Amino acid sequence: MAFEELKSKQSVMWGNGPYQNVTETIVDIHDLLVDRLDPKEGDAWLDLACGTGAMSERAARKGASVTGVDLAPALIETAKERAQQQGLTIDYRVGDCENLALDDGAFDIVSSTCGIMFAPDHEATAGELGRVVKSGGHIGLGNWTPEGGLAKMFAMMKPFAPPPPEGAGSPFSWGSEEHVQGLLGDSFDLSLERHISHLRVPSGEDYWQLFSSSYGPTKTLAESLDDDRREEFHQAWVDFFESNYRSNGEIDHDREWLLVLGTRR
């Protein structure tokens, strides 16, 4: 399925706000992925749904030759600015992970951190992963699990949001071992591990201020609502975190994620 209208909206939504503020809350995921993928000098590394470049920058500092692709033009522009400021050479491009304008077997490593999981056509995305990685090459993905804290946050948001188009895959299915095996098991030898990433802030209100200003899905949804409904969303958000995640005087949002490592057959 093409889902072109949804992806057009996603390309704007994900670029709505300074996403780099949110990537700072998943530093542990980026660090573990780059450590486990362990690039060698000159390895061709593709970072899919690269956002503002947090993973791409890490890979480039390790000596990889990095290409970063994201659906959102605004995120790519920020990523380019960040690379220039840091003196890093990274080839950033706007592109669709379901239909990449890249050669077969062009990359030693492909990564995505909480990124490709949001593409609606899971089978097309998995097919592109298998196509662009060379035989013996590696993939590394960090995907939020369906039982974890991010999925629960999105469930809290659901009553305020329009329904997804029919046939669009749930992003959190990418955090299910069974689903990932079904998508990638024929092409990759897989290793799957569950981990917990913690986001700690002083209060539910602080969490709201961060995500309603910087996280595309939350910011875009809030901006789409009238004043009364937006305040209902705001209050539901604060109550959700205060009721479920307050611990030792702060909000401790434990977010389970699935580390997917694979070697291309």
Positions of predicted regions on the chain:
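Conserved catalytic/acceptor-binding region of the Class I
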Residues: 123-124, 130, 134-203, 222, ...
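Class I SAM-dependent methyltransferase SAM/SAH-binding core
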Residues: 44-100, 124
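Conserved Class I S-adenosyl-L-methionine
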Residues: 172-265
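Conserved class I S-adenosyl-L-methionine
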Residues: 1-43, 54, 78, 154, ...
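A short acidic, Gly/Pro-enriched loop at the edge of an enzyme's catalytic core
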Residues: 98-109
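A short SAM/SAH-binding and catalytic strip from SAM-dependent methyltransferases
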Residues: 109-122
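A generic alpha-to-beta junction signature in SAM-dependent methyltransferases
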Residues: 37-39, 60, 133, 184
